[in-house]
């Protein structure tokens, strides 16, 4: 047997290695329903939302997550990955703040509650169809962790549909309706000012359909061999 078969290069801080490491840590957490999170979800960090409902736009994702849950893996394909940072996140003082002190602040809980409120306001999604996992990280790692997981999982609300994570733009900041608010009516109607028309719904749906091409295989590639075997027998 040649030496090439007995060794392999491994860089523990390469983006792919870091993404896999963070992904494994996140997958090791039991997913909870988004509408049943406790205030104990504290500290800064990153999180993933998972969908298991009937909305036709996300049928491939919902089907895969439901099969994974039946296999005892919990949901495996995030619909959205985001971050929760403390106020003043750009200041050096916050970046160097003691993580133990930040753990007492409901930073993750606040951000996830904002997402829950967004979902509750729209007419074609239900909160009970969403699950969440959250991973507490020191602020200095949060942005990197979020970016790596978005690349790792390719969540549809990060890649193909923009606007889920935005806030009310306010009276002095008129803007176009986001892609997410075009597909899911209700949230934007509660905001301070009417929004200008955004991208046509048909064009957004085309983006989503293109996103699903080869998507399932790429998600399965993120799983460990053992977890993949457990799931593939059901697909």
Show the residue positions of the predicted features.
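Boundary/linker segments flanking structured domains
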Residues: 1-79, 83-235
């Amino acid at each position: 047997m040649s030496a090439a078969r007995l060794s392999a290069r491994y860089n523990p801080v390469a983006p792919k290695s870091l993404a896999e490491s963070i992904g494994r840590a996140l997958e090791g957490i039991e997913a909870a329903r988004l509408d049943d999170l406790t205030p104990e979800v504290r500290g800064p960090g990153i999180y993933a939302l998972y969908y298991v409902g009937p909305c036709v736009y996300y049928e491939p994702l919902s089907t895969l997550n439901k099969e994974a849950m039946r296999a005892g893996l919990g949901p495996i394909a995030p619909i959205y990955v985001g971050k929760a940072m403390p106020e003043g996140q750009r200041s050096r003082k916050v970046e160097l703040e003691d993580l133990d002190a930040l753990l007492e602040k409901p930073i993750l809980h606040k951000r996830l509650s904002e997402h829950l409120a967004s979902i509750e306001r729209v007419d074609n999604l239900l909160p009970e169809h969403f699950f969440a996992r959250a991973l507490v990280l020191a602020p200095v790692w949060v942005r990197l962790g979020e970016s790596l997981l978005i690349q790792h999982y390719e969540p549809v609300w990060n890649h193909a549909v923009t606007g889920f994570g935005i806030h009310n733009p306010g009276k002095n900041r008129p803007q176009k309706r986001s892609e997410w608010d075009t597909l899911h009516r209700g949230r934007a109607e509660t905001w301070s000012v009417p929004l200008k028309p955004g991208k046509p719904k048909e064009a957004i749906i085309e983006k989503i359909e293109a996103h699903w091409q080869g998507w399932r295989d790429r998600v399965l590639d993120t799983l460990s061999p053992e977890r993949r075997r457990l799931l593939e027998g059901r697909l």
